[in-house]
């Protein structure tokens, strides 16, 4: 069991960013105890806008009757529940609650697989599965196939790219060459398009070797494209 805690400390912060909790305190917004499918659809939209939710009410929603009885192909609701479960797994990891962590991460993987059986082009869920495998220390070719699927199912969508860069960049040294190129190209494209905050975070947190690889892509941009990125990195230093 202990190996999960060790590996998890490297990847779950990236998964946490999928729901916008990075650098934020948990909000006071509550999810209704008797959540319906329509309410979960609305919840998904809020989470994808980086709104945050109270842990207790998140757990109540996940453990409630609606979550248990939800149809596997109600993909928006399933995704909302996935997004709610990630920070609960992180909280268990940080507190050393190994049994709860195993329970939460197992539930995440099961729900993700169910969602993909109905929505095989859900790039966010492919990314989540990649993160979970990484969290367990499984950075093999099959794991990177999951990340590749996330890229292939949303090659030019900023909403997923700004999340994916935070999860993918820390693994770049282990990635096959083709996947490494996808990671670097998306990092560069985000900066070029002015989406600088998450690439800056990935750059700021990177090892010297990874940072050098990212810098080589930054050097290909013109000064005006790099300016916003430089300011974003400086903010992280302050």
Residue ranges and their predicted role:
Residues 1-9:
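Short, Lys/Arg-rich N-terminal segment immediately upstream of the first membrane anchor
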Residues 9-31:
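Hydrophobic membrane-insertion alpha-helices, especially the h-region
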Residues 43-72, 108, 115, 150, ...:
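Alpha-helical solenoid scaffolds that mediate protein-protein interactions
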Residues 20-24, 58-67, 100-115, 141-151, ...:
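Alpha-helical repeat scaffolds
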Residues 11-15, 96-97, 121-122:
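Short, flexible segments with low predicted structural confidence
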Residues 98-169, 175:
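Non-cytosolic head/periplasmic domains of membrane-anchored proteins
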Residues 149-238:
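Extracytoplasmic/periplasmic C-terminal soluble domains
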Residues 33-50, 69-95, 119-132, 158-169, ...:
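Amphipathic alpha-helical repeat scaffolds of TPR domains
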């Amino acid at each position: 069991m202990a190996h999960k805690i060790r590996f998890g400390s490297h990847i779950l912060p990236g998964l946490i960013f999928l729901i916008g909790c990075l650098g934020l305190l948990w909000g006071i917004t509550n999810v209704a105890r008797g959540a319906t499918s329509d309410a979960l659809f609305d919840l998904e939209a809020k989470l994808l806008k980086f709104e945050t939710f109270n842990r207790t009410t998140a757990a109540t929603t996940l453990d409630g009757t609606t979550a248990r009885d939800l149809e596997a192909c109600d993909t928006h609701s399933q995704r909302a529940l996935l997004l709610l479960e990630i920070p609960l797994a992180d909280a268990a990891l940080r507190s050393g609650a190994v049994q709860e962590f195993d329970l939460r991460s197992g539930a995440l993987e099961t729900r993700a697989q169910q969602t993909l059986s109905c929505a095989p082009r859900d790039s966010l869920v492919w990314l989540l599965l990649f993160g979970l495998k990484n969290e367990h220390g499984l950075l093999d070719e099959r794991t990177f196939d999951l990340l590749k699927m996330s890229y292939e199912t949303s090659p030019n969508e900023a909403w997923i790219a700004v999340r994916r860069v935070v999860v993918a960049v820390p693994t770049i040294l282990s990635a096959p060459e083709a996947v490494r190129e996808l990671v670097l190209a998306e990092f560069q494209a985000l900066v070029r398009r002015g989406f600088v905050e998450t690439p800056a975070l990935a750059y700021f947190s990177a090892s010297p070797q990874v940072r050098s690889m990212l810098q080589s892509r930054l050097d290909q941009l013109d000064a005006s494209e790099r300016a916003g990125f430089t300011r974003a990195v400086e903010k992280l230093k302050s």
